[in-house]
Each structure stands twice: as C-alpha cells, then as structure tokens.
Curated annotation (Swiss-Prot):
InterPro entries: FAM131 (IPR026782)
Record family assignment: Belongs to the FAM131 family.
Pro residues bias (residue ranges): 215-227
PANTHER family: PROTEIN FAM131B-RELATED (PTHR15736), PROTEIN FAM131C (PTHR15736:SF2)
Composition-biased stretches (Polar residues): 197-211
Full protein name: Protein FAM131C
Coiled coil: none
Lineage, opening ranks: Eukaryota, Metazoa, Chordata, Craniata, Vertebrata
Organism: Homo sapiens (Human)
Disordered: annotated span: 195-280
Length: 280
C-alpha cells in the first residue's frame, strides 16, 4: 500500500511524466505534423486533471469526484481509507459489545438490587409495590444512575456508622474504669459472688449433723436445775471469725493461715484485678 501525496505538490504532475525510451522530450519547435509521444500513465488536459496517488503497483488514482481505479488494476482492489474506516467501526462495535454493554448490565443489576430488594432502607417491607417497580423501569438512565449513586452512598454511611459503633464498644471493653455503668455492674457481680460464698463448709456440716442426730428420749432430757450441756453441739462461728475468713490472706484464730479444706472468700480488690487481667 502506498501513501497518497497532496494535491498541491503535484498539480502539474502531467508536465513531468516519464517518456518512453527512444522518444524525445516535448519541444515547442517541433513541426505541427509531428505528434509527440506521451506516456500512457499520464493524463493530459485540464478537465481530466486528477490528484496523483503514488503507489508502487500503480493501483489507484483519486479524482475530485471520487475514486478511480487504474485500467491495469484488478477489480478486487480496495482503498486504504475505506479499510481504516471499516476497521475503526469494527473495533468500536467490538468494544461496545464486549466491554460497554456488560459493564452497563452489571451496573444495572446492582442498581436493581438496591432499589428492588429494599436496600434503600424502607421500613414498610422488603418488597416494593408493582407501581413503584413500573415507575423505576420507566425512569431514564440519568435518574437511574442518580438513584444508584444515592443508594451506594447510603450503604457507605450505614457501614461507617456501624463500624464507629463497634469501635466505641471495643474502647469501652478495653477501658472499663472510664464507664460508670461497668463499675455498677462489677459491684453487683461482687455482691452476688459474696452472697453465694457465705455458706461455708462448717455450716453445711452442722446442718447435716442436725438432720442425722437422733431425737432425744424423755429419759435423757436434762432437768431444769442442770444447765444444758453443749459438748456435742457445735457452736456457730462468731461474726469476727467470719469477717477474718472473708479477707484474702487473713490469719485464723490462732494466727495461722486458712486450712486447706476451707473456701477462701474473695473481696472487691481481687475481683477488680481479675477483671483487669481478663480485659487486657
């Protein structure tokens, strides 16, 4: 394929046509009876003048009225500009078929999910009425895109609010001393735990012994003058002894630590330390 040359540069191309071998160049002094020999590839005449399209195979000439094929060219020849135009049209159509249309379809599916599945936060229900569906179908593309963008922005706002709420909850869990509600809840838990830990081992043993002891006979009843013997009846622990047992690390009545069988009671300070270790 050759490249077309501008018409302005070759307006007088017929004056410089190549001459065949053995022919003399044009001379104004030639007699009128002798006709000059002209090359067959050159057209002389102002009315027949045409733009010269240089091609190595001499396949095309471009005139002011259109395209004119050379007499020696075959009928299956084509023009470069027409080929380029058709190729460009084909490329554009391929882009529309394979890129633009699938993208538009995917965007339309997302918009339909937002509008029809109730993602735009309608409190009445998840399904829209048929009238609203028809109204959405009749909307132009600009309004659909606007509603789609509004739905996406709304979803982003909802997600951001949810994440901020989660982050605030995490901060409250990491720093429970800053929240008064957490302190009240911890105090309630401490009181419940202390109430559950009050019935200790000796008191339970006393109740078992009281249920298992036989009923006293009338012969064994003490006389009114004699004081009742308290040798076999265990005495309940005094309040001071109970208070000492509640404190962690407190000594017993003899100054020693708690026996291994007794259940040590927990105070508020130890519970607070356990909560801090758990949260950290």
């Amino acid at each position: 394929m050759g490249s077309c040359v501008s018409r302005d540069l070759f307006t007088s191309a017929h004056k410089n046509c190549p001459m065949p071998q053995g022919a003399d160049p044009l001379n104004p002094d030639l007699p009128s009876g002798r006709t000059p020999t002209v090359a067959p590839d050159c057209v002389i005449g102002k009315d027949k003048q045409m733009d010269f399209c240089w091609d190595p195979w001499q396949r095309c000439f471009q005139t002011t009225n259109g395209y004119l094929s050379d007499s020696r060219s075959r009928p299956g020849n084509y023009n470069v500009a027409a080929l380029a135009t058709s190729s460009l049209v084909g490329v554009v159509q391929s882009i529309k078929d394979h890129i633009t249309k699938p993208t538009a379809m995917a965007r339309g599916r997302v918009a339909h999910l937002i509008e029809w599945k109730g993602w735009s936060a309608q409190p009445a229900g998840w399904e829209l009425s048929p009238a609203e569906d028809e109204h959405y179908c009749c909307l132009p593309d600009e309004l659909r895109e606007a509603r789609f963008a509004a739905g996406v922005a709304e979803q982003f706002a909802i997600t951001e609010a949810t994440l901020s709420a989660w982050s605030s909850l995490d901060e409250e869990e990491l720093h429970p001393e800053n929240s008064p509600q957490g302190i009240v809840q911890l105090q309630d838990l401490e009181s419940i735990y202390l109430q559950d830990s009050l019935p200790s081992g000796p008191s339970q043993d006393d109740s078992l012994q009281a249920f298992s002891s036989p009923s006293p006979s009338p012969d064994s009843c003490p006389s009114p003058e004699e004081p009742p013997s308290t040798a076999g009846i265990p005495q309940p622990p005094s309040p001071e002894l109970q208070h000492r047992r509640r404190l962690p690390g407190a000594q017993g009545p003899e100054g020693g630590t708690h026996p291994p069988g007794s259940l040590p009671s927990m105070d508020s300070g130890s519970l607070w330390e356990e909560d801090e270790v758990f949260y950290n």
